[in-house]
Amino acid sequence: MALDAALPAVGRPFALARGLTARVALTIVVLASFAVRLIASAAHPAPRYFPDEYLYTAIARALGSGRAPSVRGESAHFPALLEPILAAPFQALFGPELAYRLTQAENAVLMSLAAVPVYLLAPRLSLSAGYALACAAFAVAIPDLVFASYTLADPVAYPFAMGALAAGVAALERPARRMQLLFLALAGLATFARVQYVVLPAAFVAAAVLVDRRRVLRTQRLPLFLLALPVVGAVALGPARVFGYYANVTHLHVGGALLHWAGVDLFLLAFAAGIVLVPGALVAIARPRGRTETAFAGLSAVFGSGLLLEAALYASNGSSRFQERYLFALLPLVPVGFGLYLKHGRPGRGAVALLSLALFALAAQLPLSGYAAALGKTDSPFLVAVFRLEKIVGTANGSFVLAVLAGAAAAGAVLVSRRGGGRYAVAATLAAALLASFAATVGDSANARQVRRDYLPVNASWVDATGLRDVTLLQTVGSPPASAIEQLYWNRSIAAEALLGDARATDVYAAPRVRIARDGTMTGVGTTVLVQDYAATIRFANAARVATAGTFSLWAADEAPRLELLERGRFSDGWLARSGALTVWPDASGRTRGTVRFTLSLPAGAAPTTIRFGKARYDIRPGEQTTVIYTIDARGPWSLPFSTTHGGNAQPDLRFTSVRSTPPILARAGAPAVRPAATA
């Protein structure tokens, strides 16, 4: 008998040479994973997955303060509440920074505990304790454990999903009330944490039919009855009330792109699993032997198909990228399936060869660099690791290295099927997972630190530090939602959001558009506003500027804030957009009288640009300055549009601008000029 064919049946764990018991070794795996993820979280100083991380935290704050789930005062019909419930005590007892760090620590514990059900699953399939330990280590070595640093539902749902799969196999193997109830509880918790895992009950029902066929109503009467109750309730309530925040899933389009993304997801998931184990694992799942293996195969196949459908449906409806967040719970099943393949004596050599050849051909034809570019890696820690490699060795070299590794892994799968060496394939896969996890963690930490530097001051809770409360975040036209969400995340005193003009909201929750009266009074905001100055210059007639940070300024008034001046299209660094408008509102008399002054210029090396302000045209050349003065005498608001007629200048951050302008200085007739503090 080949050595690796007997490998899963070895009585003592091959990794426990020093006499440690398997349970002690499993404990070490869990603790080591927790320690590593805790250290990695320390290097992840700010959330960056928006708006999800903010929404979970906002709901946790509402729960922690004794309120119903809500975001900025608006009721949140959010079905995935387990993560906010677990984080609520931290939000109730501690400040934003410590609550954030404690949530990360909690996530590190939960994700590391996923090793336990994976370890328990393998021996049930007659795999050795040592092999089970390798499977458990793989479950916490995958790059997706980087999500422990995020305030998302994934870290919470992952261990419950793995536990539900292990309990489901046990309940299908020997239908007993205790194990059936355990499966229902774990599947319910996984779904309560992340709605995508609603496929778990469906997978259990399908696997039960596969295992027991006509006897299923007798053997699985209790779980079938209990699972039918929420289905009846969901039908009665309707999808909008059941799915809440996710109700739009019923309106997603099903078309040809669905099949395309299903294929892409399968290919990239196989790559993320290391390729070498995948063909053998698929053969074992396709050819189960006995009741227990049939239960595992049926549960895994339907569970995987459901997640794949969800991921492909989401990607084919606008989110065109690899949805690894939906799929990574399938990765720990690969080494388990491969163990069955070894136990069976490595059958299906032809099938393994064909699958290996197909994976290699796809890897050669589809460079991963195309999927890891730009936003393609947003939901994929594996592609973050790929991008990190390409950043070090170059895109072309990185693609070549990955194609060579894919070829070697595919060849390894064929070699194992014919000559053995399964333990080396498992060891290589585990090593590859650790290496990819390290690269993903380094890349993620760098991105999170960059977000912290770009969007936040040293004290991220700077608005709270002023002592002001019930602050309204005022989003202006052209302002990026991401920077605004960071302020919402770290400052509990920001209680509302409002939109000025055609500004973009940060999320789907309460963000009414501000109405501006003829005298400039804004309705729909409180007396304290946090203004996003990224693409607008604002001054108020009756409010004082309390503090500034980056592109934000905090203003406080004794009554409703009244606008004095707004220049839409002037960026915080002084560049003007290709078009915009300058508006001045009247004084108490109802008239707008005085002068507005600003200076136009271009730095050396910029392209000469022609810009119009109203009917006047100004030709601006690099190194020159042109001072513009307008005398105003109008009843009600006065507005001056501007637009670029020739030239323009592209910025490194992809903004297409025209010329630079100093902040407009308004000098009202009979009053001293009010000069802005900014000089950009």
Protein language model features and the residues they cover:
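Short acidic/glycine- and proline-prone juxtamembrane loop motifs at membrane-interface regions
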Residues: 76, 149-157
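C-terminal luminal/periplasmic domains and tails of membrane-associated envelope-modifying transferases
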Residues: 10, 502-680
